[in-house]
Amino acid sequence: MREIVHIQGGQCGNQIGAKFWEVISDEHGIDPTGTYHGDSDLQLERINVYYNEATGGRYVPRAVLMDLEPGTMDSVRAGPFGQLFRPDNFVFGQSGAGNNWAKGHYTEGAELIDSVLDVVRKEAEGCDCLQGFQITHSLGGGTGSGMGTLLISKVREEYPDRIMATFSVVPSPKVSDTVVEPYNATLSVHQLVENADEVMCIDNEALYDICFRTLKLTTPTYGDLNHLVSAGISGVTCCLRFPGQLNSDLRKLAVNLIPFPRLHFFMTGFAPLTSRGSQQYRALTVPELTQQMFDAKNMMCASDPRHGRYLTASALFRGRMSTKEVDEQMLNVQNKNSSYFVEWIPNNIKSSVCDIPPKGLKMAVTFLGNSTAIQEMFKRVGEQFTAMFRRKAFLHWYTGEGMDEMEFTEAESNMNDLVSEYQQYQDATAEDEEEMDEEQME
């Protein structure tokens, strides 16, 4: 079957990852010891996408956990599903990356990377037909961003034809954890543009907004935020794990969502977002889900899709519903809001339907959009980067680990190029294309 090897790196990546495994285990009826207690054969039918069956019928996640300090891993191990993971798959250093991308990518991380790759290789070899890798990490810190991108490039070298999907937490505009976030994020994006196949962008501020506004939580914790993220991640791979009428997998997603190779940064959304208490009071319909899914308030990254246009989008529905209705709704959205979709890619929404809804819901939908509005996010980080880099502030932390200023300049221009590419396609119309063709012919 089409297995996925999951890798989590750094504090953020490990916390999101741990939450993700709680959600997935719950969906497949697996308890914290790895024993199956489910009520439907469907839960086991394709359980091997994410789990390996060990002796005695235990299910062990195909997960690799890495960090440059032991702290977060200890808390994962002590957490509710800590005993689920294979002990050998925890790979950690002692020194920490201290929010320094260079430490994660060139010094501390580089020393640890081989032992991580060994574990990744072992997991990949245990697969029948490996579909690809998914990585959870943040771009603002040192380990997830620096070592995460190092791992991505190494895995890419070894498995060039497998899909590399990342769930990347981008520094948010108002909520900042470290001063050097813009540096770390820009250096990471520089890598992700080249080495990842699909990047789902998430940011804390957007998640906080969802918790405040929609879920009516007064004091959202990281646990609440991570729960939102894992709902999204589990939705993306739902079609691989449960039977459905219209299937999709990581590769199909890539083919349908990426019109130009560099533009593979997606906005993620999830519906229905209802506060934990009020779920049972309303039945959802496909039109309602569709409505909510395209709402800017539902996006898990702080870019407003109304400021750009969708190149492509993908809607992954879950639950019992008629495919005809799904298709009608999708067409309906495109026709009503045609100005928000580029007209030179007709029918640019892909939908898939999986029969099994998430726990506690009748139907749900995960949304991935490739919108030109995501350039706002890169612009924002880029401006902060430039402000500091112009004065060479904090640079000595990076050059001290052997980095060259040149690399910063390259990363900066790569990100600026990315922004202008998005802008170029946002402005492009079907008529322009004909003119461009004529110019090329001359």
UniProtKB/Swiss-Prot annotation:
It is found in: Cytoplasm, Cytoskeleton. Mg(2+) binds at residue 69. It comes from Stylonychia lemnae. Tubulin is the major constituent of microtubules, a cylinder consisting of laterally associated linear protofilaments composed of alpha- and beta-tubulin heterodimers. Microtubules grow by the addition of GTP-tubulin dimers to the microtubule end, where a stabilizing cap forms. Below the cap, tubulin dimers are in GDP-bound state, owing to GTPase activity of alpha-tubulin. InterPro entries: Beta-tubulin_BS, Beta_tubulin, Tub_FtsZ_C, Tubulin, Tubulin/FtsZ-like_C, Tubulin/FtsZ_2-layer-sand-dom, Tubulin/FtsZ_GTPase_sf, Tubulin_C. Residues 421-442 are annotated as: Disordered. The keyword Nucleotidyltransferase does not apply. The keyword Magnesium applies. Its cofactor is Mg(2+). Dimer of alpha and beta chains. A typical microtubule is a hollow water-filled tube with an outer diameter of 25 nm and an inner diameter of 15 nM. Alpha-beta heterodimers associate head-to-tail to form protofilaments running lengthwise along the microtubule wall with the beta-tubulin subunit facing the microtubule plus end conferring a structural polarity. Microtubules usually have 13 protofilaments but different protofilament numbers can be found in some organisms and specialized cells. One of its GO terms (biological process) is microtubule-based process. GTP binds at residues 11, 69, 138, 142-144, 204, 226. One of its GO terms (cellular component) is cytoplasm. Belongs to the tubulin family. Keywords: Cytoplasm, Cytoskeleton, GTP-binding, Magnesium, Metal-binding, Microtubule, Nucleotide-binding. It holds the Pfam family Tubulin. SMART domains: Tubulin (SM00864), Tubulin_C (SM00865). The sequences of the two genes coding for beta-tubulin are identical. Its main location: cytoplasm. This is Tubulin beta chain. Residues 429-442 have a biased composition (Acidic residues). GO terms for molecular function: GTP binding; GTPase activity; metal ion binding; structural constituent of cytoskeleton.
